[in-house]
Structures are given as structure tokens and as C-alpha cells.
Swiss-Prot record:
A GO BP entry: 5,6,7,8-tetrahydromethanopterin biosynthetic process
Name of the featured protein: Dihydromethanopterin reductase (acceptor)
Entry keyword Transmembrane helix: no
Domain 4Fe-4S ferredoxin-type: 150-178, 179-208
Cofactor annotation: [4Fe-4S] cluster
């Protein structure tokens, strides 16, 4: 296989709605920007991806990766049609690589079945038509158990209903129910203000949980490996290895 490395590369980075491997994906993309001279990254973010990126407090970092210049646009699915002009660049082979990390099981299932009804799945489909190689990091790589970290949450055993967290939340993401307080993750910006003011250490960030990778999702990942010009990677750090960055 012939791969193009070097200066003036253009990459599309697709983000879907997975929290697993999200922070690692950001670390890798920032590292690519540092290590590859004049690298241009166009970032595509699905609707669910935007919500998840915000709740993990990473949204602001997107502008350090895609600053809005030509071929460095930040494309949010909620602001653009599925047939965004950016995907046309892919079908014309204007980019060197497409990277989808992390890729949800839903995204992978659509891709392997030829469904291109969203910004990200359409981009991957057009990349295949334009001979643009896609590096995809599925969160459901192999059937079994994986450990992942959650965004902000409230430990109800520690919470004393002082409501200080509600007062400092800039987006109204924390609400009081009858006898407990809850973080609405769909509105959370991941700013951490609530954790800073909580006198009872009831705000939890990065709690580890176990999740099952279903066999059907792992099977779809296997099918993904069979698609033309698609390279499936187990972890975002393997992207660095692909580009010979140590």
C-alpha cells in the first residue's frame, strides 16, 4: 500500500457520539497538529458527538485543531445538511486521509451496510468513492468487557442538597428533583464549576465503569475491515504509529 506522509497534508477528522476513547482521540489529533508540518484538519462532528464533546469539557479544544481557515473548518452536523459541501471534497479526493475516532457502533453498522444518511457516514462513503483512505477507531472493537470513564455526575449519597452547583452552572444543566439533584448531560458543558463549589465533594468526574461490547457490534467491526481503503485501528494511539510518530 502507498501512503502519503509529510508536509501540507489535509485530513478530515470525524467525531461521533462516543465517550469511550474520546479524550485519547483529542490527544492524538493535537499531537498530529504538533508533529506534522502545515497539517490542515477539517473536523466533522455529529449531533451526538457535539453533545458528548461538550459534556466532557472538550469543545473549546476543537478550535485549536480546526481554526476555521480553508480546509480547517469545524463542521457541526446540526448546522449543515448531510450533503455538506465538505463531503464533496472527499469524493473528489481533495484530502489525504479521513480519520473517524471514536466511531460508535451505530456509525460502524451504517457504514458496513452502505448507509450514508448522516454527516459522518456520508463523509466516510464519499471518502471511499474518492480513493481517500479512512482510518477508523471503533469503540466496539472486540466482544468482551471494556473500561470507560464517565463525564460529570452527582454522588447522591454525598449530596446534601445545598444547591450551590445549580447556582454556578452556566447552562442550566443541573436541576433539582423532589429529593435529589441531577446533571442533564445533554446540556452539560463540562466546565467543572459545580465540582469547584461543592463543599461535600459530591460531584464526580471520570468515574470508571465496565461496559459490554456486544457480539453483533464486534462482528460489524470485522466487516468494516473488509471495506475498500478502510484501515481499522484498535486504539487512537495507533493513529500516531500509522503516521510514524513516536
Amino acid at each position: 500500500m502507498n501512503y502519503r506522509f509529510g508536509i501540507n497534508m489535509k485530513i478530515v477528522w470525524c467525531i461521533t457520539g462516543a465517550g469511550h476513547l474520546l479524550r485519547e482521540s483529542f490527544q492524538v489529533m493535537k499531537r498530529l497538529k504538533e508533529e506534522i508540518e502545515d497539517l490542515k484538519v477539517t473536523t466533522l462532528v455529529s449531533r451526538a458527538g457535539e453533545e458528548v464533546v461538550k459534556m466532557y469539557g472538550l469543545f473549546g479544544e476543537l478550535y485549536n485543531i480546526s481554526n476555521g481557515n480553508y480546509y480547517e473548518e469545524l463542521i457541526l452536523e446540526r448546522e449543515h445538511p448531510y450533503s455538506s459541501p465538505i463531503t464533496g471534497r472527499l469524493s473528489l479526493g481533495k484530502y489525504d486521509y479521513l480519520i473517524c475516532s471514536p466511531a460508535t457502533g451505530n456509525t460502524v453498522a451504517k457504514v458496513v451496510n452502505g448507509i450514508a444518511d448522516s454527516l459522518v457516514t456520508n463523509a466516510i462513503a464519499q471518502a471511499g468513492k474518492g480513493f481517500v483512505k479512512s482510518l477508523i477507531v471503533p469503540v466496539d472493537y472486540k466482544a468482551g468487557i471494556v473500561t470507560t470513564k464517565l463525564p460529570y455526575a452527582i454522588d447522591k449519597k454525598k449530596c446534601k442538597l445545598c444547591l450551590k452547583c445549580i447556582n454556578v452552572c452556566p447552562n442550566g444543566a443541573i436541576v433539582k428533583r423532589d429529593n435529589f439533584v441531577e446533571i442533564l448531560l445533554s446540556k452539560c458543558l463540562g466546565c467543572g464549576n459545580c465540582k469547584k463549589v461543592c463543599p461535600y465533594n459530591a460531584i464526580i468526574e471520570g468515574k470508571e465503569i465496565k461496559m459490554r461490547v456486544r457480539k453483533i457490534d464486534a462482528e460489524n467491526t470485522r466487516k468494516l475491515m473488509e471495506l475498500e481503503d478502510v484501515i481499522v485501528l484498535k486504539h487512537p494511539y495507533e493513529i500516531l504509529e500509522f503516521f510514524n510518530i513516536r
